[in-house]
Amino acid sequence: MPLHERCFASVASSFTRGRLERGTIVPLRVELKPFERIVIGEAVLVNSGTRISFLIDGEAPILRERDTINAETANTPAKRLYLCVQTMYLKNDIPRYRTAYQGFLRELRETNPGARVTIDAANAHVATGALYKALKEIRKLVKREDELLAA
């Protein structure tokens, strides 16, 4: 059975029972606008024209391009930490980047002591391997830095 049929079959059979069973992984439905990009692991998928929708079955690190930061734009403490965690997430390799992460974390704590709760929440997510959740927390700090720099 092709992948897309398996995805629809697994979702349909789960919902016909009225609920998702514990431990069932539901495929991720992704919609892309024309020419929008999405990063899956180390690959970038580019929508070539019309609006599309597809399912991703399995576990893979996924980020929309608008949620990524590159080395050139990582010019603040929060952005440097975000880039480091983003790299850990997309490459699925926490140990390799742990030393850099700890340095960026220390820098952010020193420059932004008022954000301790958010920084600690992000750090707790990294400690448990929940890197996507850590990115969501760090995004709050990036947004706050951008607001302060714009003022």
Locations of regions flagged by a protein language model:
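Terminal leader/tail segments of proteins
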Residues: P2-A151
